[in-house]
Amino acid sequence: MAENQANAAADEAAEPIVGHVTRIQGSVIDVEFPVGHMPDIYNALTVEIKQMGQQEEGEVKDSVITLEVEQHLGDSTARCVALKSTDGLVRGAIVHDTGGPIEVPVGDVTKGHVFDVSGHILNKKPGEKIVIKERWPIHRNPPAFDQLESKTQMFETGIKVIDLLTPYVQGGKIGLFGGAGVGKTVLIQEMIQRVAQNHGGVSVFAGVGERTREGNDLIGEMDEAGVLEKTALVFGQMDEQPGTRLRVPLTALTMAEYFRDVQNQDVLLFIDNIFRFTQAGSEVSTLLGRMPSAVGYQPNLADEMGSLQERITSTRGHSITSLQAIYVPADDYTDPAPATTFAHLDATTELSRDIASRGIYPAVDPLASTSRILDPRYVGQAHYDCANRVKAILQRNKELQDIIALIGIDELGEEDKTTVNRARKIEQFLGQNFYVAEKFTGVPGSYVPAEETIEAFTRICDGVYDNVPEQAFSGIGGIEDLEKKWHKMQKEYGD
């Protein structure tokens, strides 16, 4: 008898749990399950809907929608969020519990491919055979405390303004803050190219709630540059459901974790845009009927952000370095979305509309950008001293701008005149030509090692280039480019 009960229990466990749709409100679906068979929170559910095909064929196509369980209501009802459009879904539709969270492909199969939030390949070529050997759930715990890597090391980018004033941490989290149109996405595209060319690591890109055109352009540019084969891309763009946009970063992060933990590789994770992740969370929270918090954001904003950011870290010997574009609504840095992100970052690169309007790119604000490793213990005394001298000159120039506007630069003392002239040269020299902008500007991109950057700015601060005009410092790479441009200008215009 005991054996029969065991067999019955095994048969019952083997049978998939089936529920029925009881309520549909936009992308929020209520599903009723048999008593005692409620799926866990974050479990993936699937439901088939019938869609009519082309009229002349009259065929019926089946479409599968994935739902994610977000809440348990009374009466054995689960409230779920749909990850696809619910067009065609009706009450009474049969829903199957998959028995676990959304699982996505991991490993080498992800390189060179574009995925959606559920791990479906979007750029499969005709006749291409893809064998997926392993899948991981997107909801995972962060590494245990004793597995974390305590070593702090600078990640060299070859971009002068970043390496000098806001050095990035290998295995750290970096935020690119800025309003609309100041160059966040371009800087991320440039970093992807530089990592592939100079570091040879694996990159994972998450496109969260951004323009579909930008995603298409990015894929094309990466393919042309030959870096697509070392990159996995996951997209949930502007036209996707809020549930999709909320989970896309987790899908990309899961792929990155496999490269770090199983293949023992250093990984770069790019997220564009983390604000859209917060925005999607706000939409889902409202749809689920939660009381909004400050400025209409979800009450669990800090918890949602923390659950994502705490998984982006270094374990012993291997790292995930994350570069996150963060849109700042109306250039307001006190907005809860960017303000919540600040607490998790190791370095912040703030992009300025004023600097962009002067044609200096990347339009990084050197005084507002920060890094926790701009410290002699991590970058060395020479780097630290040079960065502080550059900031002091730029700060003094900023203070003098009101006086210059009133009485003119000629009325300043000699020391202040020298400071202003050096500051203008520094501002121009902090700009740099990018590889990804080469086809627009016609100027080749440049990689400047950190040592050369420190040497060049130390010379400017020491007055070595006081006789070189400001125009010679714009749109160039290192010292060699500066001297070439200066000699060319001398030949064209005379000594």
Curated annotation (Swiss-Prot):
One of its GO terms (cellular component) is plasma membrane. CDD domains: ATP-synt_F1_beta_C (cd18110), ATP-synt_F1_beta_N (cd18115), F1-ATPase_beta_CD (cd01133). GO terms for molecular function: ATP binding; ATP hydrolysis activity; proton-transporting ATP synthase activity, rotational mechanism. It is an enzyme of class 7 (translocase). InterPro entries: AAA+_ATPase, ATP-synt_VA_C, ATP_synth_F1_bsu, ATPase_a/bsu_AS, ATPase_alpha/beta_chains, ATPase_F1/V1/A1_a/bsu_N, ATPase_F1/V1/A1_a/bsu_N_sf, ATPase_F1/V1/A1_a/bsu_nucl-bd. It catalyses: ATP + H2O + 4 H(+)(in) = ADP + phosphate + 5 H(+)(out). ATP binds at residues 178-185. Its EC number is 7.1.2.2. Keywords: ATP synthesis, ATP-binding, Cell membrane, CF(1), Hydrogen ion transport, Ion transport, Membrane, Nucleotide-binding, Translocase, Transport. The keyword Iron does not apply. Disulfide bonds: none annotated. Pfam families: ATP-synt_ab (PF00006), ATP-synt_ab_N (PF02874), ATP-synt_VA_C (PF22919). SUPFAM superfamilies: C-terminal domain of alpha and beta subunits of F1 ATP synthase, N-terminal domain of alpha and beta subunits of F1 ATP synthase, P-loop containing nucleoside triphosphate hydrolases. It is found in: Cell membrane. It comes from the Bacteria. Its main location: membrane. It is a peripheral membrane protein. Produces ATP from ADP in the presence of a proton gradient across the membrane. The catalytic sites are hosted primarily by the beta subunits. F-type ATPases have 2 components, CF(1) - the catalytic core - and CF(0) - the membrane proton channel. CF(1) has five subunits: alpha(3), beta(3), gamma(1), delta(1), epsilon(1). CF(0) has three main subunits: a(1), b(2) and c(9-12). The alpha and beta chains form an alternating ring which encloses part of the gamma chain. CF(1) is attached to CF(0) by a central stalk formed by the gamma and epsilon chains, while a peripheral stalk is formed by the delta and b chains. Belongs to the ATPase alpha/beta chains family. HAMAP family: ATP_synth_beta_bact (MF_01347). This is ATP synthase subunit beta. The lineage of its organism: Bacteria, Bacillati, Actinomycetota, Actinomycetes, Bifidobacteriales.
